[in-house]
Amino acid sequence: MIPVVALVGRPNVGKSTLFNRLTRTRDALVADFPGLTRDRKYGRAFLSGYEFIVVDTGGIDGTEEGIETKMAEQSLAAIEEADVVLFMTDARAGLTAADLSIAQHLRSREKTTFVVANKVDGIDADSACAEFWSLGLGEVYQMAASQGRGVTNMIEYALTPYAEAMGIERQGEEEVVDERQYTEEEAEAEQKRLQDLPIKLAIIGKPNVGKSTLTNRILGEERVVVYDEPGTTRDSIYIPMEREGREYVIIDTAGVRRRSKVHQVIEKFSVIKTLKAVEDANVVLLIIDAREGVAEQDLGLLGFALNAGRALVIAVNKWDGIDQGIKDRVKSELDRRLGFIDFARIHFISALHGTGVGHLFESIEEAYDSATRRVSTSMLTRIMQMSQDDHQPPLVNGRRVKLKYAHAGGYNPPIVVIHGNQVSRLPDSYKRYMMNYFRRSLKVVGTPIQLRFQEGDNPFENKTEKLTMSQERRRKRALSHIKDRKTK
């Protein structure tokens, strides 16, 4: 499971600066979907081979009224659910009463905590950081988040215990993906193997949209139980099931449930739990409340799923019992606000009565098969060539961009790597054309598809020209002829 790093500290110590530095490598992925805003408190980060969720818990005053009364409930939950806490302080301002209050709270929680003295640029860092040792939380790590100084070392040290589980043996900051170039036979065999694996399905949504009701409807009424076993506060519940011969693992993010009445179930919402479930899933089922329409929180959760590259199915719940005018308004809003994810199937359901629930699995299987489908290099290259035949790449400085071949670069989401000359100069409009062409040709449904372009290596670059023997003889004769003419 992907680790969670919480940034904790009083206001203006640099938490947002560090958050932006850690998460900015993922901005481009969300930016590929116009109309989607990135959540400013939760994000995915990838640094020095480590992939993790980073949470900015907001500023904590730590006044005499007591720290817990001044911390937002979600900030407290973030600290509780985090695997690692980076307690950020201001080396320039020195140790404050708020820092002492925060440290006292963190010691009481027995969390894995690292004290970070930020803003050490331009000062005597060792002297400025000395007093932070009195917090009693161990070593003090120096950082200048605005310049990136000390950030990588800090993350590597904090996440070292997770290195083996994450398979940190890679170089640089590129994700390790399946880039095998399949033949037609190998692709077919691998696809058959994948179809025998359980589909991990994360059911996500903001509070009270009906996640618990839908989970219980899918599993059957006999499975309505209260999940209050140790550990469920922090981790999602993994429930295996089988449907029509296909195995699934339902990742239930509804949270700890308690029964206040016989049939009443109250759920505890956790953003962090949702993010971890999305990371671990093959397919994400996003539930939207028909009575409330598309809320900002829905778009935030959608952004997490797209950022992770997961296959996606959308279910608009509580569709029964609302009049036709509201239904028309909701559909119009979906077209307007979710038009940028035209690859995802949208279902209108009633989890309470079961209307439309059965059809969800057709789209879930379709999305999984599209996201994990293995495609041979020859087929991808043929599709690339057909796209060029239908619409030639543009001219760049009088020369046509030349695309040579394509191969798979990863799955879930599908990634197509295209090699060629001057591909870095391809306009975004042509890249979008090619992405849509590949999606149509491969019949990809329910998952985003990514294209990556790589320049062909020039074998003569940075090499001096070496003449053949005959060219060398001709050169000598020419030089001799020129020399004879000058002497005459």
Swiss-Prot record:
Gene3D superfamilies associated with the record: 3.30.300.20, P-loop containing nucleotide triphosphate hydrolases
Domain annotation KH-like: ranges: 373-457
Single GO term (MF): ribosome binding
Residues the record lists as binding GTP 2: 205-212, 252-256, 317-320
Domain of life (superkingdom): Bacteria
Biased composition (Basic residues): 473-488
Region of interest (Disordered), residue spans: 469-488
InterPro entries, A to Z: G_ENGA (IPR031166), GTP-bd (IPR006073), GTPase_Der (IPR016484), KH_dom-like (IPR032859), KH_dom-like_a/b (IPR015946), P-loop_NTPase (IPR027417), Small_GTP-bd (IPR005225)
GO BP terms in the entry: ribosome biogenesis
Pfam families according to UniProt: KH_dom-like, MMR_HSR1
Keyword S-adenosyl-L-methionine tagged: no
HAMAP family according to UniProt: GTPase_Der (MF_00195)
Function of the molecule: GTPase that plays an essential role in the late steps of ribosome biogenesis.
Subunit structure: Associates with the 50S ribosomal subunit.
Name recorded for this polypeptide: GTPase Der
Source species: Shewanella putrefaciens (strain CN-32 / ATCC BAA-453)
Taxonomy of the source species: Bacteria, Pseudomonadati, Pseudomonadota, Gammaproteobacteria, Alteromonadales
Gene symbol of the encoding locus: der
